[in-house]
Swiss-Prot record:
It comes from the Eukaryota. The lineage of its organism: Eukaryota, Metazoa, Chordata, Craniata, Vertebrata. The keyword Transferase does not apply. Belongs to the ARL2BP family. This is ADP-ribosylation factor-like protein 2-binding protein. InterPro entries: ARL2BP, BART_dom, BART_sf. It is found in: Cytoplasm; Mitochondrion intermembrane space; Cytoplasm, Cytoskeleton, Microtubule organizing center, Centrosome; Nucleus. GO terms for biological process: maintenance of protein location in nucleus; positive regulation of tyrosine phosphorylation of STAT protein. Plays a role as an effector of the ADP-ribosylation factor-like protein 2, ARL2. GO terms for molecular function: transcription coactivator activity. GO terms for cellular component: centrosome; cilium; mitochondrial intermembrane space; nucleus; spindle. Keywords: Cell projection, Cilium, Cytoplasm, Cytoskeleton, Mitochondrion, Nucleus.
Length: 156
């Protein structure tokens, strides 16, 4: 073992703004996993999912549903974050979110994307509708075991 060479360990040094962002994301995880949030979102989706269809054309009603969703869900999250972080600013966090989007965990980023990306919002409703109607992707029938032994093949 050579003692002349020092091992160089990369240590991630985060700025206060990174630490603040990470704290907000941690709180967000707690909020969206909470039963109250799940209930609010599920109730909203249950109320509106039948309006959505998989056509290329977006109906005018989608806009009002989207705006209602943003108002309801974003307001709920912002209130919960303000309880945990006095002086929290959702607008500043949204801008910070764009800078950190490559670092975000998938589910949280996808959910937050539904506030700003209409197509993500519509896709969420289409997935929910497919699930409600039993059209969700079922991979359980994807694996079939077939014997390669000729003697197990019955003759017709």
């Amino acid at each position: 073992m050579e003692t002349s060479e020092e091992e160089n360990f990369g240590v991630a040094v985060s700025s206060p703004s990174d630490a603040e962002f990470d704290a907000v994301v941690g709180y967000l995880e707690d909020i969206i996993m909470d039963d109250d949030f799940q209930s609010i979102q599920r109730t909203f989706m249950e109320k509106h999912y039948q309006e959505f269809d998989d056509s290329e054309e977006n109906k005018l009603i989608y806009t009002s549903i989207f705006n209602e969703y943003i108002s309801l869900i974003e307001k709920y999250i912002e209130e919960k974050l303000l309880d945990r972080i006095p002086g929290f600013n959702m607008t500043a966090f949204t801008m910070s979110l764009q800078q950190h989007k490559d670092e975000m965990a998938g589910d949280i980023f996808d959910m937050l994307l539904t506030f700003t990306d209409f197509l993500a919002f519509k896709e969420m409703f289409l997935d929910y509708r497919a699930e409600k109607e039993g059209r969700s992707l079922d991979l359980s029938g994807g694996l079939v075991v077939t014997s390669l032994n000729k003697s197990s093949v019955s003759s017709s």
